[in-house]
Swiss-Prot record:
The keyword DNA repair does not apply. The chain crosses the membrane at residues 53-75, 85-105. One of its GO terms (cellular component) is monolayer-surrounded lipid storage body. Residues 2-9, 141-155 are annotated as: IgE-binding. This is Oleosin Ara h 15.0101. Coiled coil: none annotated. The modification N-acetylserine is found at residue 2. It is a multi-pass membrane protein. May have a structural role to stabilize the lipid body during desiccation of the seed by preventing coalescence of the oil. Probably interacts with both lipid and phospholipid moieties of lipid bodies. May also provide recognition signals for specific lipase anchorage in lipolysis during seedling growth. It comes from the Eukaryota. Disulfide bonds: none annotated. Expressed in seeds (at protein level).
Amino acid sequence: MSDQTRTGYGGGGSYGSSYGGGGTYGSSYGTSYDPSTNQPIRQAIKFMTASTIGVSFLILSGLILTGTVIGLIIATPLLVIFSPILVPAAITLALAAGGFLFSGGCGVAAIAALSWLYSYVTGKHPAGSDRLDYAKGVIADKARDVKDRAKDYAGAGRAQEGTPGY
C-alpha cells in the first residue's frame, strides 16, 4: 500500500500528482531522503574538523615545548649558581613541611579518637562499638576460663601434696 499512488477521498494523491511530486504515501512533497548521498560530504566534514583540531593541538604543543626549552636555557645558569643554597633549602623545606603534615595528621587522629571515646563512654554507640563490646566479652570469657583452670591446677597440686609417695 505504501508504494501505490493514493487518489480520491482523503487527499495525498491528487495534491502530489498535480504538483509533480508523485503523491506516494510517506513522501514529503515530492522530495525523498537518501542517506547514502550525504555520506561522502559528511565524512569530508568530519575529516576537515578532525584535521583542523589536530593541527591546532600540534601547533600548541610545539609552542609549549619551545617555551619550556627557552625557560630551561634561561634558568639553568641561575640554578647552577644558586644550587649550593637552593638544594639544602629545598631539603629543609621538604622536611619541615613533612613534619608539619605528620604532626597535623596525628593531631586530627587524636581528636577523632577522643571524640569516639567520649561518644562510647556517654553511651551513644559510635561506629565500631559493637565489635568492641564483642571483643570485651570474648576477653572476659577467656579470663574466666584461665581463672577456672588455675583453680583446678591449684586444687590438683594440693591434692597431690596430701597423698603419700610423692
